[in-house]
Regions:
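Noncatalytic carbohydrate-binding groove/subsite architecture in carbohydrate-active enzymes
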Residues: 8-12, 16-142
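Aromatic/acidic polysaccharide-binding cleft in carbohydrate-active enzymes
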Residues: 105-198
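C-terminal beta-strand-rich structural cap/linker in extracellular carbohydrate-active enzymes
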Residues: 255-271
Length: 271
């Protein structure tokens, strides 16, 4: 297999600096050599936008500048997740102020913080559940699916993000469970190979190439990510509430979304 051909970008981060030092760029390019000369070089931070804002790098040194994202830095309830998704467009819109013409990536995007960058011993950071601090039992529920759809919506609406990477592929931080099953069947009761609801979000986006700006009159109850592939338009409609919600998108017929469900609606293509 052509592993080199599958690599889009090398990201270079520091174990000791919160933002990639500018002088690392030429050193990284030299280390990668001619073999990877056609692969983009990314810098920035694998922490949060705050770090990028405090210590902005020289955008001209890198092909891509990165920051990571999680909705649960300070609070962990579902309402916080909903509100966090809606604020992501503000963060994304501010990124070009620092990166100028350099493309922006958001990676990794995780439901829980991967570690606490401000802890004395980040690897020993203790969560507020029986699970490891970087694992959320809601990864296997509608909450992760809804939040992911809305995160994609609000990041895309800013029009400034070139790349975004969500979760892991397999396991309790992924979009499906591993063949071996859960590492903690009591606190994360999934089955081997189970596809989590968030799988359906990415399946619904397969082949889509553009996201549309859309506003909900009650985004903490129901919201929609609208996408198209140039010929077909689709809406991923999420119902955050535990009651059925009737929604209407533009002049299309109304639809009732069951409690806590996500429904994918095919829409007449307008443009």
């Amino acid at each position: 297999a052509d592993v080199i051909g599958a690599i889009d970008c090398w990201y270079v981060f520091s174990e000791h600096d919160k933002v990639t030092p500018d002088d690392w760029a030429p050193r990284a390019r030299e280390a990668l050599g001619e073999r990877y000369s056609g692969v983009a070089l990314g810098g920035g931070t694998d922490l949060y936008f705050t770090e990028l804002n405090r210590e902005p790098p020289d955008p001209s040194m890198f092909d891509v500048l990165n920051f990571s994202r999680t909705p649960q830095v300070h609070a962990f309830d579902t309402r916080t997740l909903i509100q966090n998704a809606m604020t992501q467009s503000v963060v994304a819109a501010n990124a070009p102020r620092l990166t100028r013409a350099t493309p922006v990536s958001v990676s990794p995007i995780s439901l829980r913080p991967r570690f606490n960058p401000n802890a004395t011993e980040p690897d020993l950071d203790v969560g507020n559940t029986p699970l490891p601090s970087d694992v959320d039992a809601r990864q296997m529920t509608y909450v992760a699916a809804h939040w992911t759809a809305m995160s994609i919506k609000y990041l895309a609406q800013a029009g400034s993000i070139a790349h975004a990477t969500y979760f892991e592929a397999v396991g309790w931080k992924g979009i499906m469970q591993s063949a071996a099953g859960s590492l903690d069947p009591v606190n994360f009761p999934s089955t081997p190979g189970q596809r989590f609801p968030v799988w359906d979000v990415f399946a619904g986006l397969a082949g889509m190439t553009r996201a549309h700006t859309a506003q909900s009159s009650a985004p903490e109850e129901a919201d929609a990510l609208i996408v198209d592939d140039g010929g077909n338009e689709r809406a991923l409609v999420v119902n955050w509430s535990e009651e059925p919600r009737t929604v209407r998108i533009d002049d299309n017929p109304s639809a009732t979304i069951p409690p806590t469900a996500m429904v994918i609606l095919d829409l007449p293509h307008t443009n």
